[in-house]
A protein has these predicted regions:
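Active-site-adjacent structural elements in enzyme catalytic domains
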Residues: 25-32, 38-41, 47-77, 82-126, ...
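Short, intrinsically disordered, low-complexity segments enriched in Ser/Thr and Pro
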Residues: 62, 66-67, 73, 152, ...
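Extended substrate/RNA-proximal surfaces in nucleic-acid metabolism proteins
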Residues: 93-242, 267-270, 274
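C-terminal functional module detector
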Residues: 1-52, 78-91, 95, 196-213, ...
């Protein structure tokens, strides 16, 4: 790695963009942002940027600022690189870039606000206890003045162990020989970041004299450390139902039971990103436990097919083609081997010769909006909102607002403004052709989209106003489109009470109003101010010659759906308390949106703690990865063949953005209502 260079930042444009025509309401405006963006200071993003993985090269923090300001025309964003990979030098450069990005705006005419932040990245290892899986969480800081010396990570997990391995440098150099400069730069980065010890390994004197990485192995340790440092910070779970890192039977409720939740910091939930949708709860099981504690494979249902069962079917079909006697034995043996390795990321490789399309739709919930890959239902937003746990002398539950963001790993904040350039605007990746023997094509690459946004109701584009609204949950998520959404409780004395609020009622039936207006349709290319602010090479490299460029015409809202959840301690029967949808309203949108009012006449009778939120869904438009597996159906509507959206190998078509029609949508934050004096 001595021939390579450590990461450097780029140049932030000193130009501002013209003021946005913000969406005015009587008191507040709606601002759109992205609170989950990775630069190539993140170890995984740097790795995926390499030529061996068809990467497009380095994207440092300055790129995130320039992209947010000119390409996606956001109002706010945050760089959230993985703390576990950041050195102090990289953290300092990120903060400097964040401050420089803000400095372009004058206080009187702010065009973009950048928040400091990082990702705390935790997961249990193979065979680990699912109750000790807490997942990935972004830490977003209010201030740019009171900052930690280094970000707080969760310790090495997953990809870190592969990259830290002693054989990695040799394997990389040999696999893609001769190496390019960026390959050597990555090895220098790897050697530097993984040579820095954890602060827990040093004494106080050593910590003062040398660099170390701060670690908090649990959310509780993270919350406590944020308190010790007096940091005004929000901690936002994300990608929770994504099976890439979450064990099959992991559950958000375990964090309530184990004192791993802080209701003052963990007030938001990233329900949608470029890594999929984590909204819905479905009673599905990837495996079951027998009475003697062993793993077993459940039978498929009309709604869900476990991959262990599909593994058995593939093995049986291979056996029958070879004419090898009793194929049921082969099926049962393969099913059992799969569930025995249910936490092993190599489990899909147990059947020699099986291709991604052979697995059909296994592991995926059906008839839902872009669910995360190998879905974990008890880690979903609905499961979290429905769960209540008695822990010690307290009753714990989640009261979480819903946001979206991109989780883009190429510094492209707010990348979903147009549906194009699947790999650049999303995170789909795969090895180049001569290396697919080492990293074979896999079906998970089909499940990446261009990502979502967080929308904030705030008085003006001001750091404190935005952060206050984030704290108050007066926010909502979108799938990337700038849909306008209002959702209020109408109280006879208090008037309108906005999304994210908590209230107790005893004599008043809860009545609500909801209004949604579709996003602007887009023109091709970039606005004139982009061409006067960025040189053409930067517009091509960063924006790919396409920017947020709205017309005056809006997409139409197709319908509005209401979800009602009664909070419960019966965690084994969450499907009984989640009504999705509870109500649905068809819109007659003529370009101005639609609005409805409704009342829950059962609330005063049932006297439950109840959660309400709404989804506003646009008429169908084409989207990247809109139909990840592209099923071919038979006459009965059964999926008999898939055409995965490959990212590598002989079936990868770089011109195919895998476009399919979807109903782009917005999810409101919930309104939390309890019957007065209920617990």
């Amino acid at each position: 790695g001595s021939l390579g260079s450590l990461p450097e930042d780029g140049q932030i444009s000193l130009e501002k963009r013209p003021p946005n025509n913000s969406e005015n309401v009587i008191e507040k405006q709606i601002f759109f942002g992205d609170l989950h963006v990775h630069t190539t200071f993140s170890q995984d993003a740097f790795f995926f940027s390499l030529p061996m993985l068809q990467g497009e090269g380095a994207h440092p923090p300055a790129d995130a600022c320039n992209f947010a300001r000119f390409c996606s025309s956001l109002d706010f964003f945050s760089i959230t690189d993985h703390a576990e990979g950041l050195t102090k030098d990289m953290w300092d450069k990120t903060i400097q870039a964040t401050k420089s990005c803000n400095a372009v705006s004058s206080n009187a005419d702010t065009d973009l606000i950048a928040f400091a932040g990082w990702e705390w990245t935790q997961m249990v290892g193979e065979g680990g206890n699912p109750d000790e899986h807490y997942g990935h969480k972004n830490v977003i800081l209010r201030d740019l003045d009171n900052l930690p010396k280094v970000p707080i990570g969760a310790g090495l997990t997953g990809l870190d162990y592969i990259l830290k391995s002693r054989i990695t440098p040799s394997l990389m150099l040999l696999a893609d020989f001769p190496p390019e400069k960026i390959d050597l730069d990555f090895l220098a980065y790897r050697n530097e970041t993984y040579s820095i010890p954890s602060c827990s390994q040093l004494n106080e004197k050593e910590i003062l004299q040398s660099e170390c990485k701060e670690e908090a192995s649990t959310p509780r340790e993270l919350f406590d450390r944020l308190d010790e440092l007096n940091l005004d910070a929000l901690v936002i779970p994300h990608g929770t139902s994504w099976g890439i890192h979450a064990p099959a039977n992991s559950s958000m409720s375990s964090q309530l039971d184990m004192n791993q939740h802080d209701p003052d910091r963990q007030r938001l939930f990233e329900v949608y990103s470029g890594h999929g949708n984590s909204e819905v709860y479905k009673d599905i099981k990837h495996f079951i436990k027998t009475d003697d504690g062993k793993n077993a494979c459940p039978e498929p249902t009309s709604e869900f097919e476990p991959c262990c069962w599909r593994a058995g079917e593939i093995a049986r079909q291979q056996c029958e083609l070879k004419g090898e006697g009793s194929c049921e034995d082969s099926k049962e043996k393969t099913e059992q081997e799969f569930v025995n390795r249910i936490t092993d990321i190599t489990r899909f490789g147990i059947i020699q010769g099986a291709m991604p399309e052979d697995w059909l739709q296994c592991g995926q919930i059906q008839d839902e909006f872009l669910p995360a890959y190998t879905y974990r239902p008890k880690m979903s937003a609905q499961a979290a909102l429905a769960s209540k746990v008695i822990s010690g002398n307290s009753v714990n539950r989640f009261k979480l607002g819903l946001i979206g963001s991109t989780d883009n790993h190429k510094a492209r904040a707010g990348s979903g403004y147009k549906e194009f350039a699947r790999k650049a605007m999303g995170d789909s990746w795969g090895a180049k052709d001569n290396l697919t023997w080492l990293i074979p094509p896999e079906r998970g690459a089909s499940f990446y989209s261009t990502g979502g946004l967080v929308a904030v109701h705030a008085k003006s584009l001001d750091r404190n106003y935005l952060f206050d609204s984030l704290y108050n949950r007066e926010v909502y998520a979108t799938s990337g489109e700038r849909i306008l959404l209002w959702f209020d409780l109408i109280h006879p004395l208090l008037g309108k009470i906005p999304m994210g609020s908590e209230i107790s009622l005893k004599q008043t039936e809860p009545s609500f109003s909801v209004k949604a207006i579709g996003s602007f349709k887009q023109k091709p290319g970039c606005p004139d101010y982009v061409h006067t602010s960025l040189d053409k090479n930067k517009i091509s490299r960063l924006c790919l010659n396409e920017c947020y460029n709205p017309t005056n015409e809006r997409n139409k809202i197709d319908r509005i759906e209401v979800v009602k959840i009664n909070v419960t301690m019966d965690l084994d029967n969450l499907d009984r308390v989640i009504q999705d949808p509870w109500k649905a309203f068809k819109c007659q949108d003529k370009g101005e949106g639609c609005s409805f009012q409704f009342t829950d006449s059962d609330f005063l009778i049932d006297k439950n703690e109840t959660v309400y939120y709404v989804r506003a869904i646009q008429e169908a438009t084409l989207a990247v990865g809109g139909d990840p597996l592209r099923c071919v159906l038979d006459e009965e509507g059964e999926c008999v063949k898939t055409v995965p959206c490959y990212a590598s190998g002989s079936k990868f078509d770089p011109k195919d953005d895998c476009l399919a029609p979807i109903g782009e949508r917005a999810w409101s934050s919930p309104i939390f209502i309890s019957y007065e004096n209920s617990t």
